[in-house]
């Protein structure tokens, strides 16, 4: 919900004290049977007599694609050109002379013409093959495809046992482990110096699973019995893995490139499938390798073994007439299905949560694009019902029935503060919380109407907000926390997401609590973009766009931890800006060397000429020289790596020496400049006008770099990508780019441009969410 919408809802909520205590608490002395009877009667559907809601519930539902919401989001395909129109013939002038051509020239012209025609045909064919699903109407949503062919999945390589002298040690003695157990021990050894390996829960879960695998594989080969984790020493294994890492780093760029090309060639057949005769990209076509589960936050299953997945565990899905991909030698597929009502190509059950993993089409595929489109259209459809929903939950905040009152408060919190619905978690799942699963200790009340939320949300990210709520909502939360409730008790003890979502679907087909987050994120983004003036540089417009995006990310609690390299990145950016400032000062000094009188004529222009101290300039000089030396040293190594790979003669050391001599000349120039205060005039600096033009360019670069640095610092703890990809309708970003003349490449990466191609090609600058 936007800030304006929140204030509107809060204003409309009544603050009367009457009937604050629900009926169930005022009638405690009634018999249990009569209470149950009254409760059933009171909790029956309350909207049968409500004219506005009955109209909504009786309204015949239509397919989302064909239902108009404010304006058509997808324009009709452009009209075809008339087949009868012919190009006008150019009248031959009397002065035109016909040039004779030789037979050879005629053949070359014919060949060139043929090549051009082939190129045009190729382009036309490519355009014809491109499937623009957003220009079509999907008549049957249950059928996902008619034909589907693919090449299966790629399995991780089999385990390679460690060299015979690399062992796990127990009580100081080397242990001969079977390969299956050695692999699992290696998973822990590789993480020995990480935070995971120091986590007692991680250690316990790993050790239990390690002992299980050890038992399954027959136990240690040299008879040493392993009982306690604390007596295990993984150091030798860890050192070996570190050595392997270092050896990989020592590979030349050409060797790395060769490995990458070979891998890409091997993966090529798995990257694409054939869907209804079209070539579509596959997303995750690799089966996850075995490893230790990390999990986010304080996950109770962290450290458990993710077991190796075999072909026998995998179900493939493809057309009946499609060739079945061959299973790896010595194996067979678990099952072959031909289900065209699902989108997945392969699936298997993983052992950590006993849940299914799927191989699906890539984000830029037609099926994924249609799924995204429907999600955002569903959220967009909510705006036709949101006023009625808000009116009803405002009224129900004073309902005599506790369940109705809890539903009203929950929808208020989901709508105003973008809380997730939440649900019960089992003991072996992370203790993450949403609205319906809030407990007594997660909510602190500060009169008159301040609420402090403090809990772990999705992915164990802390949700901490101190907010003001409507007085009636505050009173209800006070009631929900009354004795005998205490820490550990559910706040919404009569409510769960299924009850809430079933209730919401009385308003709109398919409406769930999740749709509110998408709606409020997109609505907030629309409102924020409307406030941006269409002026300034592209960098300034992007800064304002990111500020709008950040507002949404904060609303949705999309946080991230500050990266380890953030401080270093900021320092580098500041150094770069300082160097640009120094270059600008040098230019202005050069101007005065050409015309000293300008200092009196334009004193303001030269105000900053002494902003940098000699120490500042010396530091800048050293940075530039060090960077130049490193650049040439790396260039020398890179060139020789390439020549060595291609078996060419290596560059001599004298070449590096020659490059470094140029750097030394620059160093001497800087030293002289620092001493005299005069700049060595370049040949291009032969006029004041030319140098002033360079100053102007430097000022633009300084401004752009400063804006980018500010943006980076402001977004260091906020994840803009999560809301941009999953919650903000991509058409809003497209409209922003078209309306404000910002290149789409500045907002969407190449991957996102492919994912949201439907949005880029379907709206103009006047589209509204």
UniProtKB/Swiss-Prot annotation:
Residues 364-769 form the Topo IB-type catalytic domain. It is an enzyme of class 5 (isomerase). Pfam families: Topo_C_assoc (PF14370), Topoisom_I (PF01028), Topoisom_I_N (PF02919). Residues 1-132 are annotated as: Disordered. Residues 42-51 have a biased composition (Acidic residues). GO terms for biological process: chromatin organization; chromosome segregation; DNA replication; DNA strand elongation involved in DNA replication; DNA topological change; mitotic chromosome condensation; nuclear migration; rDNA heterochromatin formation. Residues 91-132 have a biased composition (Basic and acidic residues). Keywords: DNA-binding, Isomerase, Nucleus, Phosphoprotein, Topoisomerase. Residues 71-85 have a biased composition (Low complexity). The active site is at residue 727. It is found in: Nucleus, Nucleolus; Nucleus, Nucleoplasm. Residues 357-358, 420-425, 512-514 are annotated as: Interaction with DNA. This is DNA topoisomerase 1. It comes from Saccharomyces cerevisiae (strain ATCC 204508 / S288c) (Baker's yeast).
């Amino acid at each position: 919900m936007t800030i304006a919408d929140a204030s509107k809802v809060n204003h409309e909520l009544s603050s009367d004290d009457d009937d604050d205590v629900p009926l169930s608490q005022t009638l405690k002395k009634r018999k249990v049977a009569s209470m149950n009877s009254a409760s059933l009667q009171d909790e029956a559907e309350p909207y049968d007599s409500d004219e506005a809601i009955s109209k909504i519930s009786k309204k015949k539902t239509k397919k989302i694609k064909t239902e108009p919401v404010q304006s058509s989001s997808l324009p009709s395909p452009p009209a075809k050109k008339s087949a009868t129109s012919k190009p006008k013939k150019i009248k031959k002038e009397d002065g035109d002379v016909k040039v004779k051509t030789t037979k050879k020239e005629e053949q070359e012209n014919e060949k060139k013409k043929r090549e051009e025609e082939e190129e045009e045909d190729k382009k036309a064919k490519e355009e014809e093959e491109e499937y623009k699903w957003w220009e079509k109407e999907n008549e049957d949503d249950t059928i996902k495809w008619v034909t589907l062919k693919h090449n299966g999945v790629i399995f991780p390589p089999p385990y390679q046992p460690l060299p015979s002298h690399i062992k796990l040690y127990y009580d100081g003695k080397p242990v001969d482990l079977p390969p299956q157990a050695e692999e699992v021990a290696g998973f822990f050894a590789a993480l020995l110096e990480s935070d995971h390996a120091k986590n007692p829960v991680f250690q316990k879960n790993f050790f239990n699973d390690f002992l299980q695998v050890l038992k399954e594989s027959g136990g240690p080969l040299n008879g040493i019995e392993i009982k306690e984790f604390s007596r295990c020493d993984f150091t030798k294994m860890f050192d070996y893995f570190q050595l392997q890492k270092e050896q990989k780093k020592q590979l030349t760029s050409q060797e790395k490139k060769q490995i990458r090309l070979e891998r890409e060639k091997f993966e090529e057949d798995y990257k694409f499938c054939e869907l209804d005769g079209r070539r579509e990209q596959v997303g995750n076509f690799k089966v996850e390798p075995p490893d230790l589960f990390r999990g986010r936050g304080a996950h109770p299953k962290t450290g458990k073994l993710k077991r190796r997945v075999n072909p026998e565990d995998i179900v493939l899905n493809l057309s009946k007439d499609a060739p079945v991909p061959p299973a790896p030698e010595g194996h067979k597929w678990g099952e072959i299905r031909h289900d065209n009502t699902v989108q997945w190509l392969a699936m298997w059950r993983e052992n950590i949560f006993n849940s299914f993993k799927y191989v699906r089409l890539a984000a830029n595929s037609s099926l994924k694009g249609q799924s995204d489109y429907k999600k955002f259209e569903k959220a967009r459809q909510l705006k036709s019902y949101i006023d009625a929903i808000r009116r009803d939950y405002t009224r129900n905040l004073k309902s005599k029935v506790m369940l109705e009152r809890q539903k009203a408060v929950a929808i208020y919190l989901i709508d105003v503060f973008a809380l997730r619905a939440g649900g019960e978690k089992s003991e072996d799942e992370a203790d993450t919380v949403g609205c319906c699963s809030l407990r007594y200790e997660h909510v602190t009340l500060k009169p008159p109407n301040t609420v402090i939320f403090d809990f772990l949300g999705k992915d164990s990210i802390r949700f901490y907000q101190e907010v003001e709520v409507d007085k009636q909502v505050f009173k209800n939360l006070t009631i929900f926390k009354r004795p005998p409730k205490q820490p550990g008790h559910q706040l919404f003890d009569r409510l769960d997401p299924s009850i809430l979502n079933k209730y919401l679907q009385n308003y709109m087909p398919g409406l769930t609590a999740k749709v509110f987050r998408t709606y409020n994120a997109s609505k907030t983004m629309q409102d924020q973009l409307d406030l941006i003036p269409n002026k300034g540089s592209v960098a300034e417009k992007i800064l304002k766009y990111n500020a709008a995006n950040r507002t949404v990310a904060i609303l949705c609690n999309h946080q991230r931890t500050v990266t380890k390299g953030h401080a270093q990145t900021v320092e580098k950016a500041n150094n770069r800006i300082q160097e640009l400032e120094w270059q600008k000062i040098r230019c202005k000094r050069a101007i005065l060397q050409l015309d000293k009188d300008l200092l009196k004529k334009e004193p303001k222009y030269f105000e900053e000429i002494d902003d940098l101290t000699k120490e500042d300039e010396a530091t800048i000089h050293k940075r530039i020289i060090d960077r130049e030396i490193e650049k040439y040293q790396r260039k020398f190594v890179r060139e020789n790596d390439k020549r060595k790979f291609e078996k060419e003669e290596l560059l001599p050391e004298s070449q590096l020496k020659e490059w470094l001599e140029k750097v030394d000349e620059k160093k001497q120039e800087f030293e002289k400049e620092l001493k005299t205060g005069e700049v060595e005039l370049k040949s291009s600096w032969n006029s004041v006008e030319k140098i002033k033009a360079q100053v102007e360019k430097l000022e633009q670069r300084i401004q752009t770099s400063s804006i980018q640095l500010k943006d980076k610092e402001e977004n260091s703890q906020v994840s803009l990508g999560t809301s941009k990809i999953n919650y903000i309708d991509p058409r809003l970003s497209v409209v922003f780019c078209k309306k404000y003349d910002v290149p789409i490449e500045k907002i969407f990466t190449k991957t996102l441009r492919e994912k949201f191609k439907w949005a880029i090609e379907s709206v103009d600058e006047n589209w509204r969410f």
